[in-house]
Amino acid sequence: MDELPNGNGAALLKRGRGRRRRHPQSQPRGASVLALPLRPRKIRRHRKSAAASRVAALRARALRSEDSDSKVAVASVRGKRKRPAELLEASRSAEPRPVSARPRSASATLPSRVEGWAALSRNLGTAAPPPPGSHADEPGRPRASPLQQVLTELNGIPSSRRRAARLFEWLLAPLPPDHFYRRLWEREAVLVRRQDRSYYEGLFSTADLDSMLRYEDVQFGQHLDAARYVDGRRETLNPPGRALPAAAWSLYRAGCSLRLLCPQAFSPTVWQFLAVLQEQFGSMAGSNVYLTPPDSQGFAPHYDDIEAFVLQLEGRKLWRVYRPRDPSEELALTSSPNFSQEDLGEPVLQTVLEPGDLLYFPRGFIHQAECQDGVHSLHLTLSTYQRNTWGDFLEAVLPLAVQAAIEENVEFRRGLPRDFMDYMGAQHSDSKDPRRTAFMEKVRVLVARLGHFAPVDAVADQRAKDFIHDSLPPVLTDRERALSVHGLPVRWEAGEPVNVGAQLTTETQVHMLQDGVARLVGEGGRLFLYHTVENSRVYHLEEPKCLEIHPQQADAMELLLRSYPEFVRVGDLPCDSVEDQLSLATMLYDKGLLLTKTPLVPS
């Protein structure tokens, strides 16, 4: 399908393809959600009791479940039933909206790594929702798009975890998220048809892409790819250097699809969208944008190593999705090479995506896409869960477990039998030698003992540290900005700085800036707090950022991390002295990692 940011740098692997074919047969459009099944697959640090009791008292409330107002039918296709097809309707492509503000650069000199919600909402180019009590349908008043409405709603939700859950609920609506995770995630292709062309309005448009080409340093190969799929072959036609409008649009007119890698580096709204959702997944969330000319296909059939959510923004596109061809391709860990049409069977899903529609499919599902009927297509692919499997976790755990077992248990240091090569190895695989049976039993016993030595928490911390480094910097709500160092009224005025000197006291109530903004990790006998507030919107442009936490402040740091979103008095932090309490809280506040219950007043 498409290509997303990958482990190397710019994107998790993904593509987008299709091929000219006859129109799919029509079918009734009564169902708004279509789920297509794949065979399901099965898949410590010591803390003081005082700190633990405080955390128990400050335990965060559980998320409310929110029912969707929409009523939909859910259709499943199982076994070898006839593949679904959607009616290809003649409808106008979405007009690109005018850009009211120039997109931000992807360079290392971004003016602000942490930006406020209200400032980003202004980039949507649509009217803000009317205040309570006003007349939303007043003649002449532009209506806010569903996207801007939900972003405005998120700005009023104090918990970052609840914001992530709400935005994901909106993305799937009317499909309930709990049903999606329980029955469809990693198992089935899902189509959500909304019949609302404005649903994603303001997220990204062809006008945004044109503005980026004009005003930003967009480079072919690094930020933008030009590709086409003709006569069963994929071609990439990237010239060297900057992707100026004349070159990019000439390639588009020549039938090339344009793939924008890592649009979150340029688009504040895409950044905002992904920065919220990454907390929902607990895994890096990336994206690519694909603009495909009418009557063309940009990419060959293939599968990817990420969970893919396709958001149709403009125009229409015919998609064909195929099951993994054999069990080895289910939940694939690497992306496939390009396939020919002869490699494919019958699609399990054949449908035309319209603006506002959503398509999801798991890793290993082969897909291709093409534009037809003289209409272009613009879609954004959101990707996540690259190399985030049990196998990847165990791949990190087991070598460390073996190393620890060798050091701590003499049974792992005993020598192999002198004659083991006489009955072990491929040439002896059919041997009934009892020595072979004994050898295999010994291996099983030792492997079973490895669980005792497995450093599961240490590996979990390392993966959490990697996720912190992968993450986008946080986008702040108005409340988070006002109550953190980011909103202090310090400024230069009349020849001198004013409003300087705001200080925390033992009575100040604080909590972390957001839920997923930091992680405490032990390394080499020292403690470090890795955080996202100084990350770049460009993948791994910066080295991991961290603060060293003194051992006497470790329990206090853990309390702050675990008690979010409840407030804690600085004087209640489990430290040995008031000095330790204030120094920890002040360091975190000054770094932008902590917010207060009420604004600090400069002295």
From Swiss-Prot:
Cofactor binding description: Binds 1 Fe(2+) ion per subunit.
GO-annotated biological processes: chromatin remodeling; negative regulation of DNA-templated transcription; negative regulation of osteoblast differentiation; regulation of DNA repair; ribosome biogenesis
Subcellular location as annotated: Nucleus, Nucleolus; Nucleus, Nucleoplasm
Reaction(s) the record says it catalyses: N(6),N(6)-dimethyl-L-lysyl(36)-[histone H3] + 2 2-oxoglutarate + 2 O2 = L-lysyl(36)-[histone H3] + 2 formaldehyde + 2 succinate + 2 CO2; N(6)-methyl-L-lysyl-[protein] + 2-oxoglutarate + O2 = L-lysyl-[protein] + formaldehyde + succinate + CO2; L-histidyl-[protein] + 2-oxoglutarate + O2 = (3S)-3-hydroxy-L-histidyl-[protein] + succinate + CO2
Gene3D superfamilies: 3.90.930.40, Cupin (2.60.120.650), JmjC domain-containing ribosomal oxygenase (ROX), dimer domain (1.10.10.1500)
Name of the top EC class for this enzyme: oxidoreductase
Residues bearing the modification N-acetylmethionine: M1
Modified residue annotations for Phosphoserine: S65, S68, S91
EC number: 1.14.11.27, 1.14.11.79
SMART domains in UniProt: JmjC
Outcome after substituting H367A: Abolished lysine demethylase activity
Amino-acid positions noted as binding Fe cation in the UniProt annotation, renumbered to this chain: H302, D304, H367
GO cellular component, one term: nucleoplasm
Metal-binding as UniProt keyword: yes
Comp. bias (Basic residues): 14-24, 39-49
Keywords of the record: Acetylation, Chromatin regulator, Dioxygenase, Iron, Metal-binding, Nucleus, Oxidoreductase, Phosphoprotein, Repressor, Transcription, Transcription regulation
Domain JmjC: 256-401
Distribution of this protein across tissues and organs: Present in developing bones (at protein level). Widely but not ubiquitously expressed.
GO molecular function annotation: 2-oxoglutarate-dependent dioxygenase activity; histone H3K36 demethylase activity; histone H3K36me/H3K36me2 demethylase activity; histone H3K4me/H3K4me2/H3K4me3 demethylase activity; iron ion binding; peptidyl-histidine dioxygenase activity; protein demethylase activity
Assembly: Interacts with SP7/OSX; the interaction is direct. Interacts with PHF19; leading to its recruitment to H3K36me3 sites. Interacts with MYC.
Function: Oxygenase that can act as both a histone lysine demethylase and a ribosomal histidine hydroxylase. Specifically demethylates 'Lys-4' (H3K4me) and 'Lys-36' (H3K36me) of histone H3, thereby playing a central role in histone code. Preferentially demethylates trimethylated H3 'Lys-4' (H3K4me3) and monomethylated H3 'Lys-4' (H3K4me1) residues, while it has weaker activity for dimethylated H3 'Lys-36' (H3K36me2). Acts as a regulator of osteoblast differentiation via its interaction with SP7/OSX by demethylating H3K4me and H3K36me, thereby inhibiting SP7/OSX-mediated promoter activation.
Classification via PANTHER family: MINA53 MYC INDUCED NUCLEAR ANTIGEN, RIBOSOMAL OXYGENASE 1
Protein name, UniProt field: Ribosomal oxygenase 1
Organism: Mus musculus (Mouse)
